[in-house]
Amino acid sequence: MKTALDRIIDYKRDEVRALKKDRSLGELENAAAAASPVRGFGSALSAIADADQNALICEIKRKSPSAGDILPGADPVEIALDYERGGAACLSVLTDMPSFGGSLADFETIRAAVSIPMLRKDFMIDPIQIIEARAHGADCILIIMSAIDDTLAGELHDCASRLGMDVLVETHDEAEMERALRLPSPLIGVNNRDLKKMVTDLGTTERLAPMLSSDRQLIAESGIADPESIIRLRKVGSRRFLIGEWLMKQGTSRAEQVTRLKLAC
């Protein structure tokens, strides 16, 4: 039986085929070269984390396979500005439409409205998606180790690096962490959500954190819903956090809650 991740990767293959048919590689490379300059994603995180505050990557998504509808009518720019006002280091913007309700149009609109770095959050399976991401202004891309093999992970990483982008490498278990650490990116995410079973456990970050050396930057992802979650994960060394669903639901107090999480200790 196929998992949620399997089904996503299946339609990503269709999307990549359509992209290659619709736009030539040369066209995308020219657009990437003409895009606005890269904003340093990792350096923005470090500027806050090195001061012993919590560097937050605040996420925008209208829905998800695990939560269903989160905020289907959301104005992405309004949410992004709330995050920026609250002190977010960076943004994560879902560009997957079928499962998360996002788009590259959302990404571009948000990019024009904020000054902080942005991650294109999607399921990358081909270098052409990386080039497309830079063409739309992305500063960082995501590599999900559970979705691809080591050869492809290396190709995606190298493509992003050539374009000057940062790379967030996402893991969920020990085997994926070992594979991720073979890549040179310092940004190592631990997703507390199992993308195959769609269950969440903060203990995942606690278990995997000791595998990272001091030259890597641990980013705890998923399941962070209050200051207590952050305080718990700070005990294993995390100062960088990706938070989405809970913040999306905070309404008029969203900026205030970002500040509260940033200062939690």
Curated annotation (Swiss-Prot):
GO terms of molecular function: indole-3-glycerol-phosphate synthase activity; phosphoribosylanthranilate isomerase activity
Coiled-coil annotated residue ranges, if any: none
Cited CDD domains: IGPS (cd00331)
Enzyme Commission number: 4.1.1.48
Gene3D superfamilies in the record: Aldolase class I (3.20.20.70)
Keywords: Amino-acid biosynthesis, Aromatic amino acid biosynthesis, Decarboxylase, Lyase, Tryptophan biosynthesis
GO process terms (BP): L-tryptophan biosynthetic process
Residue ranges crossing the lipid bilayer per the database entry: none
Pathway: Amino-acid biosynthesis; L-tryptophan biosynthesis; L-tryptophan from chorismate: step 4/5
Reaction it catalyzes: 1-(2-carboxyphenylamino)-1-deoxy-D-ribulose 5-phosphate + H(+) = (1S,2R)-1-C-(indol-3-yl)glycerol 3-phosphate + CO2 + H2O
Signal peptide positions on this chain: none
Domain of life per record: Bacteria
Source species: Hyphomonas neptunium (strain ATCC 15444)
Gene name of this polypeptide: trpC
HAMAP family for the chain: IGPS_B (MF_00134_B)
Protein name as it appears in the record: Indole-3-glycerol phosphate synthase
Family according to the record: Belongs to the TrpC family.
InterPro entries named among the record's database cross-references: Aldolase_TIM, Indole-3-glycerol_P_synth, Indole-3-glycerol_P_synth_dom, Indole-3-GlycerolPSynthase_CS, RibuloseP-bd_barrel
Top-level class of the enzyme under EC nomenclature: lyase
